[in-house]
């Protein structure tokens, strides 16, 4: 099992997005509707314009995402 950080954001309309950020720099983005996954995509940090995991986490927190423990 890979170690990961999960961050999510959901609007009042039930639409949302979740990021699984793995320690090796891989990222899976899930697009959600009313708690159900409707699509996902695998990318790396560079595709998101970040050079470190910390930078991506800070950017997402600044955009209103919440860390899921």
Model region roles, listed by residue range:
Residues 8-64:
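Acidic, low-complexity, intrinsically disordered interaction modules
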Residues 1-3, 65-69:
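Short intrinsically disordered terminal tails
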């Amino acid at each position: 099992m890979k170690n990961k950080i999960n961050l999510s954001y959901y609007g009042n309309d039930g639409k949302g997005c979740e990021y699984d950020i793995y320690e090796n720099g891989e990222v899976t983005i899930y697009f959600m509707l009313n708690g159900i996954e409707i699509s996902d995509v695998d990318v790396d940090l560079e595709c998101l314009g970040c050079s470190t995991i910390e930078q991506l986490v800070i950017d997402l927190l600044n955009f209103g995402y919440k860390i899921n423990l």
